[in-house]
Structures are given as C-alpha cells and as structure tokens.
C-alpha cells in the first residue's frame, strides 16, 4: 500500500512512521519534574530515542484549535477551528468539532 485516504483526503504512507504525543494542557515543568524524579520511564525512553519539544499554545487554548494548528502550521484565524464546540444554527445545538470539512486550509502532512 502506497497511499491511504483519511477524511476524504489522500496521503502517502510514510516510509518511516511518525508518532506525535500531545500532553494537552500540561505545563512542561510537570514533565521535567517527573523525568528528574524518575517516575516517567516511558517518556524518558522516548526522549532518549526520539525528539522531545514544547510548543507555544494558540489562543483560544482549547484542544481542537491547538491540534489543528499543529497539523496545519497556521493559527485559528486561518484554519478556522476556534474551539472544541460550535453552535449548529440549524438545530440550535452545541456540536463537537470533529468534521475535517470544517478546516479552511490544508495540513502539513
């Protein structure tokens, strides 16, 4: 298999898989302290064998806008995901933002 389709978009299957682990809402100092105290052995192994970095959050500091910024490289004003929920005007209900069609730009993938 050389390609895969996700949410209606085609992607090349990576030659070398990449895994991104996001500690949402976690101050990097918590991780540093846990590593120093030796209570995060799996994170320590990941750090030793891969890449570890901290990212600046976008505003608003909700999960979906930040994850969208990670995969697009642009702020919420560009990609269009400004929260975890939106008000569906047709039904008057709050809906969780999970539909890839709501993205206004491509990804870095």
Please annotate each region the language model reported.
Residues 1-17, 25-109:
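Active-site nucleophile/metal-coordination loop of metallo-enzymes that catalyze phosphate/sulfate
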Residues 22:
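Generic enzyme active-site microenvironment
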């Amino acid at each position: 298999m050389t390609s895969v389709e996700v949410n209606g978009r085609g992607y090349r299957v990576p030659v070398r898989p990449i895994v991104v682990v996001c500690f949402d809402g976690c101050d990097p100092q918590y991780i540093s302290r846990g590593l120093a105290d030796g209570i995060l052995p799996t994170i320590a192994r990941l750090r030793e064998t891969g890449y570890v970095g901290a990212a600046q959050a976008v505003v608003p500091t909700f999960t979906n806008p930040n994850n969208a910024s990670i995969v697009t490289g642009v702020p919420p004003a560009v990609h269009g995901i400004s929260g975890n929920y939106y008000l569906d005007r047709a039904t008057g209900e709050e809906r969780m933002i999970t539909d890839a069609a709501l993205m206004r730009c491509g990804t870095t993938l």
